Amino acid sequence: MRRTWRWVLGVLIAIVLVTALVLWLLLRGSLADLDGEHALPGLAKPVTIERDGLGVVTITAGSQADAMRALGRVHAQERYFEMDLMRRSAAGELSALFGPKAIDADKRMRVHRLRARTEANLQAALGDNGTAVRAYVDGVNEGLADLSVRPWAYLLLRQSPQPWQASDSVLTGLAMYADLQDPGNQTELALSRIRAVVPPALYALIAHDGTEWDAPLFGEPTGNAALPDASQLDLRTLKGKTGTEQEEGDVIGSNNFAVAGALTADGRAIVADDMHLGLRAPGLWFRVRLRYPD
């Protein structure tokens, strides 16, 4: 009896060890290759990719196209799943990865037809950057194909990553636009409902967008909102409650400030920005320094 239990225990231990080894090999194979020399088809000259102690990448190339091709490889090997999520979120294609749970999110974006509109106007969207974008796309697909194992997230989802396209690079930018804007148009819908039930002077105060501190790049600043006087708005005449408890929620907007050089000790201007973007893991920003001749 003891021999039987020992044999069963030994088999279980062996299964656990083999399973752990297979998982380790799969995860290890999906990691980016950070060392050595690699052939990257399409390069006109050799490119150097370096990382500092914090993992920040510096790419040194002989041309912009070569730098973008190398950047595409780096992005694919270290961030492809996140890139895939961004293009799919903009195009309304997340349910192809996650199933029915993502259908509602897809519906909110599909109404804009961003993939169809991007592909129909791709040349105009790329402008003079067509060569650089195509080099980047080739680098992305080469870097993805060069991974020993597809990124681990696809293993969990039992999916295969689809190749990158030039239109996907535009869609990732549109995904950030949707993150910073109101793709569901909820703000305008809410203002429309408010306008139907409040006096014009109160609506003008609520809907006013701007302050005396604004410095727009285009057009003139709108200034501060005008406070209605008693002849325009008498709160005592409003029906129903005049106040409600404010619900807690995400605060939309970013913190920015600029200080002129005339106000600093060494004469240099200061610009700071704290963008209120969604929290992601890994982070949205991927810092890279590109070095190539003008």
Question: Can you say where each PLM-predicted feature lies in the sequence?
Answer:
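Catalytic core of carbohydrate-active enzymes
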Residues: W285
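Substrate-recognition/specificity elements adjacent to catalytic centers across diverse enzyme folds
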Residues: L23-I270, M275-A281, P293
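N-terminal Sec-pathway targeting helices
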Residues: M1-V18
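Catalytic or ion-translocation cores adjacent to nucleophile or general acid/base/metal-coordination motifs
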Residues: V288-D294
